[in-house]
Regions:
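N-terminal signal-anchor/first transmembrane alpha helix
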Residues: 1-29
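Periplasmic/extracellular loop-to-transmembrane helix junction in inner-membrane transport proteins
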Residues: 3-4, 31-74
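Transmembrane-helix boundary motif in ABC transporter permease subunits
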Residues: 71-101
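C-terminal transmembrane helix and the adjacent membrane-cytosol boundary/short C-terminal tail
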Residues: 91, 148, 179, 183, ...
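Short cytoplasmic-facing helical segments at TM-TM junctions of multi-pass membrane proteins
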Residues: 99, 146-184, 212
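Generic hydrophobic transmembrane alpha-helix motif, especially the helices
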Residues: 102-138, 145-146
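Glycine-rich helix-loop "coupling/hinge" segments at transmembrane-helix boundaries
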Residues: 117-118, 147, 194-231, 250-260
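Transmembrane alpha-helices
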Residues: 129, 133, 166-198, 222-225, ...
Length: 263
């Protein structure tokens, strides 16, 4: 059994490396090894963050980016889940859908930005479309994979007990595929922010990406670093949220009990 000290160390261990990097960064800036034209000091970044926060500009851009990300993820994730269920549950569905989806998946969706701008302009629908497209494929693939890798013995046993159709799907197939689906959700959440960063830096007049590009034009490297750190923190927050959902929805899974016990 882990001692309180060991538990505390395990909790703070993920922060050792980031804190060490910031400490070295501050030291290099203080002694003049690192020019502020190349990279501002942590103190300068904190000052820029405070200034943007106090003016309300940062929170306005953050709210807009978060709204775009959530709407795009909801649309793309829902479509990916539905299409994955169709392909996973039906051989005919797989024959009709999978080849086309795999072809689209191999087209870099960020390469579609010029076409998307022509179709939608630079309004919200362009960013939401790109985020939805980026998040669709990880959830589709992992949903299909989860369904196709369910233990056939469990399915046959459930059928022998009289389960079929919707009850079989709810009680056996969906729980069996859920771990794989959640992996797809975590990948999709990472791609959600990655896609939005590029979309906002190319075709936007608001959002965190726009804030960074606007700061670049005026050589405000401290604001650029603030935007980068914000994206990193938002990505981490999304990943932690997905982990919490895994623990909530998969608390019946012995693998998660084992993981908790080892910690």
């Amino acid at each position: 059994m882990a001692t309180p000290v060991k538990k505390w160390l395990l909790r703070v261990a993920p922060w050792f490396l980031p804190v060490g990097i910031v400490a070295v960064w501050q030291l290099a800036s203080s002694v003049g090894w690192l020019s502020t034209r190349i990279l501002p000091s942590p103190e300068g970044v904190v000052t820029a963050f405070w200034t943007l926060s106090a003016s309300g500009e940062l929170w306005q851009h953050l709210a807009i980016s978060s709204w775009r990300a959530l709407i795009g993820f909801s649309i793309g994730g829902s479509l990916g889940l539905i299409l994955g269920l169709i392909s996973g549950l039906s051989r005919w569905g797989e024959r009709l859908l999978d080849t086309s989806i795999q072809m689209l998946r191999n087209v870099p969706h960020l390469a579609l930005i010029p076409l998307v701008i022509l179709w939608f302009g630079i309004d919200e629908s362009a960013k939401i479309f790109l985020v939805a497209l980026g998040t669709l494929f990880p959830i589709y693939i992992n949903t299909w994979h989860g369904i196709r890798n369910i233990d056939r013995g469990l399915v046959e046993m459930a059928r022998s007990y009289g389960l079929s159709g919707i009850p079989l799907f709810i009680h056996v197939i969906l729980p069996g595929a859920l771990p794989s689906i959640m992996v797809g959700v975590r990948f999709a959440l990472g791609l959600m922010w990655l896609t939005l960063i590029v979309a906002e830096t190319i075709s936007a007049n608001s959002g965190i990406g726009y804030l960074a590009m606007n700061a670049r034009e005026f050589l405000q490297t401290d604001v650029v670093v603030v935007a980068i750190i914000l994206y990193a923190l938002l990505g981490k927050l999304a990943d932690v949220s997905a982990q919490l959902l895994e623990r909530l929805w998969l608390r019946w899974n012995p693998a998660y009990h084992l993981k908790k016990a080892t910690v």
